[in-house]
A protein has these predicted regions:
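DnaQ-like (DEDDh/DEDDy) 3′-5′ exonuclease domain used for proofreading
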Residues: 116-119, 125-178
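Active-site groove signature of glycoside hydrolases
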Residues: 216-225
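Short glycine-biased active-site loop of nucleotidyltransferases that positions the nucleotide triphosphate
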Residues: 54-58, 105
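Carbohydrate-interacting/catalytic domains
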Residues: 1-54, 62, 66-71, 79, ...
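Hydrophobic or amphipathic alpha-helical targeting/insertion segments
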Residues: 81-126
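C-terminal reverse transcriptase regions that engage the nucleic-acid substrate
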Residues: 338, 342-346, 507-508
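Catalytic P-loop NTPase motifs of RecA-like helicase/translocase cores
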Residues: 100, 228-229
Length: 731
């Protein structure tokens, strides 16, 4: 028997992510309390709750750290929500945004920023913002046409923008020009905060920490820690001030691990998401699907080449000002510095100026230096630049780390993943689309080392596709010939842009049924992110019109065939959907459920995945009033697993169970066993389970999905005859 898991604070059993909006605030969440309790979750996980831009649909554009957002119900509404949830045995997790605030329109909507624009470095809020005061003024990139700003008393107006007048401490520049401040990625409307300053930390966290102390908030999710000057120090200060369960939105690549000295409980789960997805992808599909992709798009076979080109483009397009500022600190050859940034294989390394460089961080940057050196002329000062960003002046060390993340995010997440997509279910945040399939043994080894406090997830507000869209796409790895024939048929009828068409067909099928409005919005965003034909900075009305025509024709002329293909793979997609959901919910860690995904959800990237959720339908299904069989099955798996987790010691060890090539199976201590079908097409083609069996741990077991009871060695054909998954509880 394992020792019971203990922590000095309450660790959620599971969480349910809610996207708060002006239309869905605290009162609406409170009304869900009975449903969520019956579903089995332990905590409601709220999107940002501080005052944000009016009508903001996401809340990451904070305008005032001293107030709870009025549109949601304000502080009293939040307290009432917390009380209602508590009555149902539920807690509250809050999403906090320490890295940035918004530059609103009009700019007077951010009082702290207005003070700085008015009084410059003499403002008491000047230390809040990461501003480059070179020349005594901060660049504000808002000018988009020949209209002249107009002075109106103490205000300078430019269209909807407002600035203090006179313009003593700022200059208005072209909107495409880099701003005079650190920003979130390339988003000039989000200005970086300096929470490394203790006074700034205290001022920007006072309300949130007060809610923690009051017992209204029970845990925290930290947005974008990689933007901070010193994430380790920030998390130490946060833990000292709050001492509650805390997870961080840290994107890990490949075998990268969360720094051991970070005082937090884990990540928000993208690392687990990508490993689970690969479990349900057949590596044998790699070669034919890559060839199919190359044939349709003309893109390279090699993903790494696309990544390098994409990162170079975003550095040149978006980050000239940031690189110039960094180069001023680092010195030496600018091109060497750029190549080092492009070569970084992860979002950033972690070095604290004045402290010894951690071995893992040194290895990351030095390895990137070797890659950069191979691309630069002989004699380029790579070693000197590497040494400066690891051991040089404090600003050089910190600025380098803070720009690595934006280059990776914009170059890979928001460019390369929209250019290289042989199998789009692999194109996720932190994913590696050239890494087809996952080895069961490797997954078991990873799962055995998972922390009981880290978050796991399958869908978030930032995923490129919902879990059920990915479940459908994963089937294509087992049906490359059938998929090639279908795409060939559709493309012969309707085509538009070779760089986009193949992505369009994947997403049209996987998100089916989808109307022309949603489908156009997705492809329009995808085309702008890819930047091969249009971009956010370079729109093209003619291209947009052509895309609208493509969308209409694709649905009108090919919709019936697309629907037929989706229906044909439904048994396999359903198996993938239920399998990945069961695995995620029963792994070590704190499983998060993105709102609405307790049943099927075929959403694409935001804002599509932030649409309102039909909770009356979900209540009806949970009450057993019938519905779509896939929905019923997914809800049953979700509800049974979440409620079993409430009865399970979170420290129950992960024990791999042998189940052959077409199943993933594991026990959680002596109380639970999960079995999920994988690669279902191959299983069907070989004639089913045959004589394969699974040996259950000692004792009597009951399948929570069917009520059947088992002991000892069980034929998989018997165990999985009703559902493609089984969830057993020890009796």
């Amino acid at each position: 028997m394992s020792e019971p898991f203990t922590a000095p604070y309450t660790v959620p059993v599971s969480t349910y992510r809610i996207q708060l909006t002006p239309d869905f605030g605290f009162a609406e969440v409170a009304a869900l309390a009975p449903y969520l309790r019956k579903l089995g979750v332990s905590h409601v996980y709220l999107s940002p709750i501080l005052q944000a831009e009016p009508e903001s649909r996401h809340g990451y554009d904070v305008t005032d750290h001293s107030r709870i957002r009025a549109e949601f119900g304000g502080i009293e509404g939040l307290r009432a929500l917390s009380a209602t949830l508590s009555e149902h045995g539920l807690g509250v997790i809050a999403d906090i945004v320490p890295n940035h605030m918004t530059v609103p329109v009009p700019e007077s909507g951010n009082a702290a920023l207005w003070s700085v624009l008015k009084d410059g470095q003499a403002s008491p809020y000047a230390p809040w913002f990461d501003i480059d005061w070179t020349g005594g003024k901060v660049n504000m990139p808002v000018i988009g046409d020949a209209t002249e700003p107009v002075a109106d008393g103490g205000v300078l107006r430019y269209h909807d923008h407002e600035f203090p007048y006179p313009d003593t401490h700022y200059r208005l520049v072209d909107w495409r020009q880099g701003p005079g401040y650190r920003r979130f990625f390339d988003v000039s409307s989000l200005i970086g905060l300096r929470v490394e300053d203790p006074e700034v930390f205290d001022a920007t966290h006072e309300v949130i920490l007060g809610l923690v102390e009051e017992g209204v908030v029970d845990g925290l999710r930290v947005d974008h820690p990689d933007g901070l000057a010193e994430p380790r120090g920030y998390l130490s200060r946060l833990r000292a001030a709050s001492d509650v369960w805390t997870v961080v939105e840290k994107i890990l690549i490949g075998e990268e691990r969360l720094p051991a000295d970070w005082d937090c409980d884990g990540t928000t789960g993208y690392d687990v998401l990508n490993r689970i997805t690969r479990l349900f992808v057949d590596p044998a599909g790699s070669r034919p699907l890559v060839e199919l992709f190359v044939t349709h798009t003309g893109m390279p076979h090699d993903y790494a080449t696309v990544v390098r080109r994409s990162k170079r483009e975003v550095v040149d397009l978006f980050f000239t000002a940031e690189v110039d500022r960094l180069h001023a600190e680092v010195g030496g050859d600018r091109e060497t510095l750029v190549e080092l940034l492009i070569a970084m294989p992860v979002y950033r390394a972690y070095v604290v100026p004045g402290e010894p460089v951690p071995e893992v961080s040194a290895s990351i940057v030095e390895s990137a230096g070797q890659v950069a050196a191979a691309r630069l002329p002989e004699g380029a000062p790579v070693a000197e630049v590497v040494d400066r960003v690891l051991r040089g002046p404090a600003d050089a060390v910190v600025r380098f780390q803070q720009i690595c993340g934006p280059v990776m995010a914009k170059g890979v997440e928001d460019t390369a993943l929209y250019r290289w997509y042989p199998l789009a279910c692999l194109n996720e945040v932190g994913g590696e689309p050239d890494h087809f399939g996952g080895d069961v043994g490797e997954f078991h080894a990873f799962a055995r080392e998972m922390s009981p406090t880290t978050m796991t997830t399958l869908s978030t507000h930032d995923t490129k596709r919902s879990e059920d869209v990915r479940a459908r796409l994963a089937v294509l790895s087992e049906l490359p010939e059938e998929w090639a024939a279908a795409v060939g048929e559709w493309s012969s009828k309707v085509s538009f842009d070779p760089a986009l068409d193949y992505l369009a067909w994947q997403n049209l099928m996987a998100a089916w049924p989808i109307g022309p409005g949603r489908f156009f919005d997705y492809l329009f965003k995808a085309a702008r992110e890819a930047k091969t034909s249009i971009s956010w900075a370079a729109p093209d009305p003619a291209y947009e019109a052509g895309l609208r025509d493509f969308v209409a024709r694709a649905i009108d002329e090919c919709g019936a065939s697309v629907a037929e293909f989706a229906a044909g793979i439904e048994p396999y997609a359903r198996a993938n959907s239920l399998g990945q959901k069961l695995v995620q919910l029963m792994l070590p860690g704190v499983p998060d459920l993105y709102w609405g995904n307790e049943i099927t959800d075929f959403s694409l990237v935001d804002p599509d995945n932030r649409r309102p959720v039909d909770f009356p339908l979900r209540r009806q299904l949970l009450a057993g009033e019938g519905g779509f069989p896939w929905d019923e099955a997914k809800l049953a798996v979700t509800t049974q697993a979440l409620n079993l987790r409430r009865r399970l010691d979170p420290a129950s060890p992960y024990v791999p169970l042998e189940a052959g090539d077409h199943a993933i199976a594991f026990a959680r201590g002596e109380r639970a066993v999960a079995v999920a079908t994988r690669l279902p097409v191959g299983l069907a083609r070989r004639g089913g389970w045959g004589s394969e069996t699974i040996m259950l741990p000692h004792g009597a077991w009951r399948d929570l999905l069917t009520g059947a009871e088992y002991t000892g060695r069980i034929p998989l054909a018997h165990l999985l005859c009703t559902h493609p998954v089984a969830l057993l509880e020890g009796e």
